[in-house]
Amino acid sequence: LDLTVPAAHAQVNRAALEAGKHVYSEKPLATDREAGRELVKLAESHHLLIGCAPDTFLGAGLQAARAVLDAGTIGTPVAASAFMVGFGPERWHPDPAFFYAPGAGPLFDVGPYYLTMLVHLFGPIAAVNASAVIGRRQRPIFSEPLKGSLIDVTTPTHVSAHLEFVSGPATTLVTSFDVPASELPRGEVYGESGTLSLPDPNTFGGPVKVRLVDEPEWRPVPLAGDYEVESRGLGLADMAATIRSGAPRTAARHRASGALALHVLDAMQSILESAEARQWRTLTTSCERPAPLSTEVAA
């Protein structure tokens, strides 16, 4: 279980795999796609499993949202939006400088929750287009023990992306550490016959709501399963269950898989590359849409 800072993930994960260990990593899998790709290939060549956070898409809230989509309640999804906006971690984190270095920023730090949620709902991403800015080149720290120190910002702090999914939905994703206050939703899916309101993908619960075109009010969706609060470790439990089952280890059979994490990493790097080049980027990876969580996984 790798809980090191993002810049160390590739090195630590590689060392564990080379020592013959299965690996479950904090997100992101690595800070660039080639390092992530090498980790997935290394795991496959050693007949080992590699998994990666986040696993919040396995929680009761996003499992309920998935069930709504799979049931066709809002019709075919046409578009979606997701927003992770705030004012940055320097007001609460004791040592927040790494949040403003390559491999972090709002996209790499919190973006994996949102991108993993979207891939869980829609499947793999085909291409991205984006713009990005560094809101302030230096940011003061407001938390102890480094209060008053300045952080040199070297990665974008406001990123706006358009995601083109293989399955079709045109999706907007905004991640930002430059928003003092906002009333934007965490996420919404717009179907042919209704809208699905998504929960915070950095949590395991709700609320999940739906409103059809002929309905005057939003109605709550019952959550799916028992994992509503503080259920971090579901992805690791799912991977452990796969290992115990004796299933072939050459495929990403567990849900929070290395293939999923690599695809999310590819999407994030492609977003930043698109913003820098001011042009569309086609992703070079893909993954399976994770299967819904079965009730026995974390038993």
Predicted regions and their residues:
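Beta-loop-alpha module in the N-terminal Rossmann-like domain of NAD(P)-dependent dehydrogenases
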Residues: 1-42
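Short glycine-/small-residue-rich Rossmann-like dinucleotide-binding loops
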Residues: 4-5, 73, 175
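A short helix->loop->beta-strand "cap" motif at the edges of active sites that frequently abuts
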Residues: 19-21, 46-48, 169-170
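Hydrophobic residues in well-ordered beta-strands that form the structural core
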Residues: 25, 31, 50-52, 173, ...
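C-terminal capping/lid region of NAD(P)-dependent oxidoreductase domains
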Residues: 48, 75-79, 273-299
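Predominantly a Rossmann-like dinucleotide-binding segment in NAD(P)-dependent oxidoreductases
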Residues: 56-152, 278
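Contiguous beta-strand/loop segments that form the cofactor/metal-binding neighborhood of enzyme cores
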Residues: 116-204, 233-250, 270-271, 288-299
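Glycine- and charged-residue-rich phosphate/anionic-cofactor binding loop of Rossmann-like
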Residues: 220-224, 242-264, 283
